[in-house]
Each structure stands twice: as C-alpha cells, then as structure tokens.
Swiss-Prot record:
It comes from Xylella fastidiosa (strain Temecula1 / ATCC 700964). A 1,2-diacyl-sn-glycero-3-phospho-(1'-sn-glycerol) binds at residue 140. Belongs to the Lgt family. The chain crosses the membrane at residues 10-30, 57-77, 92-112, 119-139, 202-222, 230-250, 264-284. The gene is lgt. This is Phosphatidylglycerol--prolipoprotein diacylglyceryl transferase.
Length: 301
C-alpha cells in the first residue's frame, strides 16, 4: 500500500528551541551503543578497559561522529556552498551529515584515544564496530521521519509519497509537490488515489534494515567469539560498503546529480574504498593474533 509521508520532523518544542526527531535518533543511537558497549566491557572484550574508560572512549567517538559527519558533508556534498558561505558548517539545524565523514571522525578519535591508552588502534576499532550499526539504523529512521534522502520513483506497492521530493527523478532541482499544492490538497489527491505515480522507494528504511538491523545481527554474532585482530573491522567495512553501494541504485543521488556514467553516485564512489579496505583487513586478520577476552574484574583502566 502506498503511504503518504505526513510525519512532523519536530518531536517537540522547548520554548523557541525545536527538538527534531533526527537529533533524538542520534541520542538513541549513542544510548544503545553505551548499553551494548558496557555489556562487551563486562565480558572483557576490550582488554584493560573498564566502564569508566569506555565512557571516555564513547564521548570522543560521539564528538568524532558529529564533527566528522558535518565536515564530511560540507566537503563531499556541499563544497561549493561551503566556499560561498563557510558559516554553513555551523548551521547543523539545517541538516546535512555524512556517514563517511563521521567514520573518518570516529577513526581519528579512536586513534587518539588508543594512543593515549597505549593500545593497538584496531583492537579498539574491532570492539566498537558491532556497536555502530544500531546508531546507523536509528539515523536512517531519523532520515525517514524527516522526509529526506528519499529514493527514486517506483511502481511497487510499498512506495512512499514524500511531499518535499521533486515531482520526477530528472531534471534535478525542479519543484517539489509541496511547492505546487498545499498539504491539504496533497491529502485530498492521495485519498482519491491520484498520487500513486509520485511514490518513491523508502530508501531510508532499506538502509535502516541493511546497515542497521542486518549488520548489527551479523557483527554481534560474529564478534561473540574471539576473532583475529582486524577481522571485525574488516567485516564492518565490507558489509557497509556493499549495502550502501546497492541501495544507492534506488536512492536519489545527493543534489540530484550523478557523478559518472549517468548512474554512479558520490555515495557509491565513497563506498568502493570501504569494500577494498574490508577485504584488505580480512587479509591482515589471517596473519594476526586472536585476543582472548579478560573477565571484567581483572581490568584496570
């Protein structure tokens, strides 16, 4: 059944401050990561680190996600706008976060924290990797609630009508449905069954399922057994790269522009290195040690 997206992206207001669902999804993701990470710490999955140490790590990882995600979006998807108006970097309430930028930010934060703790960086990355998909899933749900990052037009019965989406897939930059008629008229047309040809793939939900639920289950089960260094990180990079590359085929490209061949998107270009890195990390894991967990009472940091 075709669904008309009519969800208010604002969860509630505190005086002049409007709290968006997308921000709450970020908080839910970080909260879930803390709960799951605490469980792994108690199982001794990060040698020599206790819950206080993990809380410290998570704080810096959160900073890496937010700062890296915003800077990455400006560099990868809105560089021209950033050059025209550098202050756009700080207008986070207008939206615009990049997974690949957030990933770089997290890796930099983990590298700094690992160096300070005198730990191997990839022991920490392997520990964190199973915690990330939950946040990715919540983030994609936030994208769906916000009615952004929609998919291409579809004739499938589960399509979603996004009033903010363009009226067709090409050309880029044309008017959205809400620019032509008001929302009351949109609801009337929807009830009369006149908007079916404007339905789009709910690509945000596809990503929430693949990058969130599926990746979490696979990585969580895979990491329950001690694995060689690099193995969990490699599996994360490989799965995300493949899933993101595939979903991009039914997702509208950022800014409505394909990078090459009339079908290749910037998201696919940024995901290809992750696939290569994932395979390389698997190769490294074949010649790396397996670190056995240390029970929580024995940890010191």
């Amino acid at each position: 059944m075709i669904y008309l997206h009519a969800i208010d992206p604002i969860a509630f207001s505190l005086g002049p401050v409007k709290v968006h669902w997308y921000g709450l999804m970020y908080l839910a993701g970080f909260g879930a990561a803390w709960c799951l990470g605490r469980q792994r710490i108690q199982a001794g999955r990060l040698l020599g680190v206790n819950i206080d140490g993990f809380s410290d790590l998570l704080f810096y990882a959160m900073m890496g996600v937010v700062l890296g995600g915003r800077v990455g979006y400006m560099l990868f998807y809105a560089f021209h706008d950033f050059l025209q108006e550098p202050l756009l970097l700080f207008r986070v309430w207008e939206g615009g976060m990049s997974f690949h930028g957030g990933l770089i930010g997290v890796l930099l934060a983990v590298a700094w924290w690992s160096r300070r703790q005198r730990m191997h960086m990839f022991d920490v990355v392997d520990f964190c990797a199973p915690l990330v998909p939950v946040g990715l899933g919540f983030g994609r749900l936030g994208n769906f609630i916000g009615g952004e990052l929609w998919g291409k037009l579809t004739h499938n019965g589960w399509g979603v009508i996004f009033p903010r989406a363009p009226l067709s897939d090409v050309p880029a930059g044309q008017l959205a449905m809400q620019d032509v008629i008001n929302f009351v008229q949109i609801q009337e047309h929807y009830a009369a069954g006149l908007l079916g040809h404007y339905a789009r793939h709910p690509s945000q939900l596809y990503e929430a399922f693949l990058e969130g639920l599926v990746m979490f289950i696979v990585l969580w089960l895979f990491s329950r057994k001690p694995r060689p260094r690099y193995a969990v990180s490699g599996l994360f990079a490989l799965l995300y790269g493949v899933f993101r590359f595939l979903v991009e085929f039914v997702r509208m490209p950022d800014n409505g522009v394909y990078v090459a061949f009339g079908w290749l998107t910037r998201g696919q270009i940024l995901s290809l290195p992750l696939i290569v890195i994932g395979l390389f990390l698997f190769w490294l894991s074949c010649r790396s040690p397996v670190l056995q967990p240390v029970p929580a009472p024995e940890v010191a940091k």
